[in-house]
C-alpha cells in the first residue's frame, strides 16, 4: 500500500466528474487500499478517488474512533434522504479550513463493496454527512461551493497561502 498525493484547491482536477467503475478487480482493490492508507495518514474520515486524481466513483470512509470500521462505496447511488442537519465540515483538499454546510440528516444509498458485491446502507449522523460530502466530490463539488462567494474567496486565499508556506519549508 502507498500514500497518494491529495489534490488541494484550486486544482481543477477536483472539479472532474468521476466515471463509474466498470469492474471491481485487483487494481480497484489496490486503489481502495491506497486510499485508506492515504486517508489515515492525512487523519481524515473520508476520501473520494477524485481527491487523489483518480476519476472513478470510489469512496472510502471510517468515522470510528478506533479507525477500524472501514466502509467502501464503489459506484454509490443516493436512494433517499430526509431531515436537515449540518456541522462544520473540513476537507483534505481544503486543508485547515472548516465551514457549516447544510446536509440531509439521514441517507439511504446503494453501492458495491470492496469485493464488488452490491449492498444498501441507511446512515445518519456523522456517517450520513460524510457520505454526502464524499459523493459531492464524485461530481466535482466541494463543501465550499455551498458558501457565499466572499467566504469561498477567503478560503481559497488561506489555502493558497498555506500551500506556499509548506512549499518553502
Curated annotation (Swiss-Prot):
Q: Write out the transmembrane intervals.
A: none
The cofactor note from the UniProt entry for this protein is: Upon overproduction is isolated with 1 Fe(2+) ion per monomer, a Ni(2+)-bound form is as active while a Zn(2+)-bound form is inactive.
Q: What processes in GO biological process is this protein linked to? A: co-translational protein modification; translation
Q: Write down the InterPro entries for this protein, in alphabetical order.
A: Peptide_deformylase, Peptide_deformylase_sf
GO CC, one annotated term: cytosol
List positions binding Fe cation.
91, 133, 137
Please list the residues that make up the active site.
134
- Cite the SUPFAM superfamilies for this sequence: Peptide deformylase
Q: Which GO terms describe its molecular function?
A: ferrous iron binding; hydrolase activity; peptide deformylase activity; ribosome binding; zinc ion binding
Recite the UniProt keywords alphabetically: Hydrolase, Iron, Metal-binding, Protein biosynthesis, Zinc
Reaction(s) catalysed by this chain's protein: N-terminal N-formyl-L-methionyl-[peptide] + H2O = N-terminal L-methionyl-[peptide] + formate
EC number(s) reported in the record: 3.5.1.88
Q: How does it assemble?
A: Monomer.
The record's function comment reads: Removes the formyl group from the N-terminal Met of newly synthesized proteins. Requires at least a dipeptide for an efficient rate of reaction. N-terminal L-methionine is a prerequisite for activity but the enzyme has broad specificity at other positions.
Q: Quote the protein name from its UniProt record.
A: Peptide deformylase
Q: Which organism is it from?
A: Escherichia coli (strain K12)
Amino acid at each position: 500500500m502507498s500514500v497518494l498525493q491529495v489534490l488541494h484547491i484550486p486544482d481543477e482536477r477536483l472539479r472532474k466528474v468521476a466515471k463509474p467503475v466498470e469492474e471491481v478487480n485487483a487494481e480497484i482493490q489496490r486503489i481502495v487500499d491506497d486510499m485508506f492508507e492515504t486517508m489515515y495518514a492525512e487523519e481524515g474520515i473520508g476520501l473520494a478517488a477524485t481527491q487523489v486524481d483518480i476519476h472513478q466513483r470510489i469512496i472510502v470512509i471510517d468515522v470510528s474512533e478506533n479507525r477500524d470500521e472501514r466502509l467502501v462505496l464503489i459506484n454509490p447511488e443516493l436512494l433517499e434522504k430526509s431531515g436537515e442537519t449540518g456541522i462544520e465540515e473540513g476537507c483534505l483538499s481544503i486543508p485547515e479550513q472548516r465551514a457549516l454546510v447544510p446536509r440531509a440528516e439521514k441517507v439511504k444509498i446503494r453501492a458495491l463493496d470492496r469485493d464488488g458485491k452490491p449492498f444498501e446502507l441507511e446512515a445518519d449522523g456523522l456517517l450520513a454527512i460524510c457520505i454526502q460530502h464524499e459523493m459531492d466530490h464524485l461530481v466535482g463539488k466541494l463543501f465550499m461551493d455551498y458558501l457565499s462567494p466572499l467566504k469561498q474567496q477567503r478560503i481559497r486565499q488561506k489555502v493558497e497561502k498555506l500551500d506556499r508556506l509548506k512549499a518553502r519549508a
